[in-house]
Design a protein with these regions (language model features):
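Short, low-complexity N-terminal intrinsically disordered segments enriched in polar/charged residues
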Residues: 22-59, 171-182, 190-195, 199-203
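Surface-exposed, charged secondary-structure patches
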Residues: 26-27, 37, 70, 79-132
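Bacterial N-terminal signal peptides
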Residues: 9-19
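Short, well-ordered alpha-helical segments enriched in acidic and aromatic residues
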Residues: 51-69, 76
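Bacterial N-terminal signal peptides that target proteins for export
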Residues: 1-10
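Short beta-strand edge/turn micro-motifs at domain boundaries
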Residues: 27, 137-168
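A mature extracytoplasmic/lumenal domain signature
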Residues: 61, 71, 121-124, 140, ...
Length: 203
């Protein structure tokens, strides 16, 4: 009797779980249209970066938006954001010829009324003017606000692992090369001094 009761209870739990899952699957996403707009913004930002088109990027941002760049520098407002980008990417005294990325969304955006938050990862490639190109993985997070019926970026944060990245690996490699070079130079110097001392003794 107890075994039969247990089976009935298990069956009821399974049926209830199936019913809840079915209802959840049939419930329409209240933010479906918002998600489409946010993905369009995401695409425009990514394409703007890869085309070196700061105007295309800024068009997705509120006029008072803040961007925290990979070097931890902050830009506030369209003019400041454009000035930073042109100082870093381009020609003349710029640091980079170009900057490209392949971005991914980590999870669906979270909504709090007319505010949406999302985050993800980026596979970046930098082409400096004065050195070889290098790649680095980074992370991004964004806060968007629905203003006058349209979604705009109000805060964009870019970050990278400062303790483990390709630039640090390169520095470590250079340290090893320098150490090996110093050791070799020391051995050569000791060999030369040894020969000189032996020559003096022979005299």
């Amino acid at each position: 009797m107890r075994q039969q009761t247990y089976r009935v209870m298990v069956l009821l739990v399974v049926l209830m779980g199936w019913s809840v899952a079915t209802i959840a699957a049939d419930t329409p996403d209240a933010h479906a249209e918002d998600r489409k707009q946010l993905l369009q913004i995401f695409s425009e930002i990514e394409n703007g970066i890869n085309e070196q088109n700061i105007e295309r990027m800024v068009a997705q941002m509120d006029e008072n938006a803040t961007v925290i760049w990979l070097n931890a520098e902050a830009s506030r407002g369209h003019a400041d954001i454009k000035a930073y980008y042109k100082r870093m990417v381009g020609t003349g005294d710029a640091i980079l010829k170009k900057y490209m990325t392949k971005a991914k969304v980590a999870a669906p955006a979270r909504f709090m009324g007319d505010i949406a938050v999302a985050d993800g990862t980026m596979e970046d490639e930098f082409v400096p003017i004065k050195r070889d190109a290098f790649k680095m993985n980074s992370n991004w997070s964004v806060t968007c606000a629905k203003l006058n019926g349209k979604w705009k970026i109000v805060h964009l944060h870019l970050s990278a692992n400062v303790f483990n990245n390709s630039l640090l690996d390169e520095v470590k490699q250079m340290v090893w090369y320098a150490a090996a070079g110093g050791l070799l130079a020391g051995l050569v110097l000791m060999f030369g001094i040894g020969r000189l001392m032996r020559g003096k003794r022979a005299d």
